[in-house]
Amino acid sequence: MRFFDRETEFEKLREIEDLSHEVAQFTIITGRRRIGKTEMVKKFYENRTMLYFFVARKAEADLCDIFIEEIRTKLHIPIMDSKGMSFATIFKFIMELSQNQHITLFIDEFQDFYRVNPSIYSDMQNIWDNYKNKAHINLIVAGSVNTLMNKIFKNKKEPLFGRQTSTMHIRP
């Protein structure tokens, strides 16, 4: 995919990346389907280490197996057997790890955690709140279903309300 007129978005990603080395960053990227959100982030990080978690419509345990393999491959960290591991356990592990090294984590189709296990959002809130002040993490989440992304991040009754440090809406 070729990128045209994404300099503004790349500059914003660069600023966020730089900040994340000092203080934890939580960025939301929204925009309609097939507009290039995923490819834009992947292109920006093509020469940097980035964990990429795609939230497929699978069981949580199956997703965790895939996420653990991504951690092993990209960070070269031996991790215990992932059998029975939850996303909360993996996210906590990453947040703990980010206290000693910078990590960029990109979670794609973030709204689909609703189908996997809606309590993941509460778990993330608790873990984020407990670790963000000591972490050097660049957490990027992207979603294509605006109604769900708005519910997750803009509804005062939802656990991740107000947690983001940046929001990017990608237009054609």
Residue locations for each model-derived region?
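Phosphate-binding site recognition
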Residues: 1-172
